Amino acid sequence: MPLRIIFMGTPEFSVPTLAALVEAGHEIAAVYTQPPRPGGRRGLDLQKSPVHQAAELLGVPVLTPVNFKDAADRQAFRDFNADVAVVVAYGLLLPEEILSGTRYGCYNGHASLLPRWRGAAPIQRAIMAGDRETGMMVMKMDKGLDTGPVALTKTVPIGETMTAGELHDKLMHAGAALMKEAMVKLELGELPLTPQPQEGVLYAAKISKDETRIDFTKPAADVHNHIRGLAPFPGAWFELETAGRTERIKVLGSEPAAGAGAPGTILDDALTIACGDGAVRPTRLQRAGGKPLATPDFLRGSPIAAGTRIC
């Protein structure tokens, strides 16, 4: 029989999983998502999350508690009498009363190979660390931060030039298929649970503004991983002095390149940039207020001479 599911998620990453559960014939009793946030050009309009919008199209009740500190919100969750809660990038901590508030508990779709990269930014951190693979896991949630037993795993390779945005999309769809499979096995009583290893724990801290600036004194491999791990958002950047003013330029893609020089020096007309060891060549750039451009197109409008130092 189909399961009665409470779905909990917020960003675009969560939407394919919700759609997959509906397609599989499960009953979505309710959708929980974060409250609408100020948005629009002036930040005056309240914008609903991608999951909120998807749920409304499905005609499913949507709840947007700020947290679960209010007893009425916790009771409302239990009153749905759901078989299971499916959680994908919800963004709120769940108290034990919620974790145990359905027949089978809460199952989370997490974008890493746990216990590596527990926490808020597993996709970015995996690329920034130079990992060659990552994956999606379905785990049963407990009171710890991504510490629960693992049910299913799908490994996904990370290409040498793959950006966080590209990996996000691969994992988003892999996660939807994996959760769909997990719910079938849960229905049949055949969903295995394996405790996470005690070794290899790493935490994927939220990306801070302070770490988005590119440090060209680092080895080229680290700079390349930094750039692609932050692309397209929030975007790694450098500053360039032009016509007596400082301009910030985002680098949304790069490739390793041959070359050597003082870190931050432009080595040729293709914008190869010297690093602490080796060099990188940006492949996609964006200036403030502009649209992303392939580097040759960017340089056609704004050439940067070899020998220029960037900071």
UniProtKB/Swiss-Prot annotation:
Residues annotated for (6S)-5,6,7,8-tetrahydrofolate binding in this entry: 112-115
Listed Gene3D superfamilies: 3.40.50.12230
A molecular function (GO) term: methionyl-tRNA formyltransferase activity
Disulfide linkage: none
An annotated GO cellular component: cytosol
Matching SUPFAM superfamilies: FMT C-terminal domain-like (SSF50486), Formyltransferase (SSF53328)
InterPro entries: Fmt (IPR005794), Formyl_trans_C (IPR005793), Formyl_transf_N (IPR002376), Formyl_transf_N_sf (IPR036477), Formyl_transferase-like_C_sf (IPR011034), GART_AS (IPR001555), Met-tRNA-FMT_C (IPR044135), Met-tRNA-FMT_N (IPR041711)
EC primary class: transferase
Flavoprotein is among the record's keywords: no
Family indicated by similarity: Belongs to the Fmt family.
Role, per record: Attaches a formyl group to the free amino group of methionyl-tRNA(fMet). The formyl group appears to play a dual role in the initiator identity of N-formylmethionyl-tRNA by promoting its recognition by IF2 and preventing the misappropriation of this tRNA by the elongation apparatus.
PANTHER family: METHIONYL-TRNA FORMYLTRANSFERASE (PTHR11138), METHIONYL-TRNA FORMYLTRANSFERASE, MITOCHONDRIAL (PTHR11138:SF5)
Protein's name in the database: Methionyl-tRNA formyltransferase
Species of provenance: Sinorhizobium fredii (strain NBRC 101917 / NGR234)
Gene: fmt
